[in-house]
């Protein structure tokens, strides 16, 4: 088995072909299909005289089984003559050794020769292993990706779950394309709710519970004090109405909400005691969040938050807005009338009447600070589509302030999750969601007593498969679409689900375990022994993986990779009854192990990119 793309290029030369031309878009060392793109561009240019730089980008890919490996719409080359006739003429003149070329209307369809494709693709995968599909196109570029971003003392709701899954994938994807990525969790850790929380903790707080599970306990405290505040407000309104009915003056008492606002104002003014209480709640919550994210194979380079923008920086941003004549005053509040620049954007408030800031002000300061720190080429905010208007306003403000990096900011939005609840009630915390998924998966596994008895660590396997189920259900459709959270469907081994993906990987692992060959022996396999059409179909799919990642990167879509992985697993499943390994002669075994091993590697790479832990046994 050849072991490098250089050797493949040399083998093309020995067939009487010229060395492959160099294209800016081509990356033959990381993407084997680019070898064919380069070869086709070179050969077609000899036939029709069109410059190769025009032919190469006109070659279109498709992962549909019924489509050609590459298609070329003849009109894109702008050659005089009827496109149908040109397509037919060029197809007849094209060399027949490595590529089968047919004319289909105005299209040229290129199908790669199965044996040559197999000799190209499989050695590359075995050589590059976990690096197969990765490239260096983003080398030297920096991306800051802000995702998850829950609010302290509030539930980790479905929107945060989607942001976590999509954001972690985008971070992994950017790294796979050579980018330097900074993962940021921008916490909702500032605001009046902390005043309410501090008041509530004095009444309902428990130190042991706070240390054991700070996020859950602070949420419980917040719910209770909020209920107190609501009850108090209702009483104040009732007392006021009663006094007014009797013609008596009424002076409302200082409410819990009033006290909360005062507490937050002290925080903004730098009061040490108030900040000490807040900092303790924040630090304990972050410690717990880190444990939760670790369980999902997610890490952050920075835990940022609204609190981390200094008052000095926010004042600087407001002063800058004033100097640009963008600030207007309305009843003591400061706002920007963006409708003057875009009617759809309306007005955006940057400072309340009492002088306290809003998250818009803090987001402006945060973005400014972030660029000064990272000098990013791209800053991604992974936030639901409900915030589309907000980010349009924010980015417009960046533009009006003259920030050169304004166009480098991107809002990656997503739809809603509907009906996310457990069979025992509402699952409002990420830990709850994962625990229920684990329990549900464990129940499914226990239904097959024979297989369950063979699993060495069923609790750990159930946990991994449960987390896979959550991620895959969220990632199957386009991110902008809403989807219904379905526990039964999600935890099924039937259909295109997370559990099925894990099963497919573990089954591929078992193929290798059933025979005793070294990697070196498999890499020396005679690939000419792979002659079955279904084997060539699988090789074609394996060769498409680098392009799949490029498309996922282009559209920032998790579903692009997930859809591909299911196509891959279906193609592999079809081969189990055709390409037996056990009981076959040695050379046949090695060739088939080379194919199944490459399939496992690509499946593993894709699953890892999605943030999953591929299982060897289950």
Swiss-Prot record:
Its EC number is 6.1.1.19. Pfam families: Arg_tRNA_synt_N, DALR_1, tRNA-synt_1d. PROSITE patterns: AA_TRNA_LIGASE_I. Its main location: cytoplasm. It catalyses: tRNA(Arg) + L-arginine + ATP = L-arginyl-tRNA(Arg) + AMP + diphosphate. It comes from the Eukaryota. GO terms for biological process: arginyl-tRNA aminoacylation; cytoplasmic translation; mitochondrial arginyl-tRNA aminoacylation; mitochondrial translation. SMART domains: Arg_tRNA_synt_N (SM01016), DALR_1 (SM00836). InterPro entries: aa-tRNA-synth_I_CS, Arg-tRNA-ligase, Arg-tRNA-synth_N, Arg-tRNA-synth_N_sf, ArgRS_core, DALR_anticod-bd, Rossmann-like_a/b/a_fold, tRNAsynth_Ia_anticodon-bd. GO terms for molecular function: arginine-tRNA ligase activity; ATP binding. L-arginine binds at residues 146-151, 160, 359, 363, 387. GO terms for cellular component: cytosol; mitochondrial matrix; mitochondrion. It is an enzyme of class 6 (ligase). Residues 60-61, 104-109, 496-510 are annotated as: Interaction with tRNA. The keyword Nucleotide-binding applies. It is found in: Cytoplasm. Keywords: Aminoacyl-tRNA synthetase, ATP-binding, Cytoplasm, Ligase, Nucleotide-binding, Protein biosynthesis. A motif ('HIGH' region) lies at residues 149-160. Forms part of a macromolecular complex that catalyzes the attachment of specific amino acids to cognate tRNAs during protein synthesis. PANTHER family: ARGININE--TRNA LIGASE, MITOCHONDRIAL-RELATED, ARGINYL-TRNA SYNTHETASE. Belongs to the class-I aminoacyl-tRNA synthetase family. This is Probable arginine--tRNA ligase, cytoplasmic. It comes from Schizosaccharomyces pombe (strain 972 / ATCC 24843) (Fission yeast). The lineage of its organism: Eukaryota, Fungi, Dikarya, Ascomycota, Taphrinomycotina.
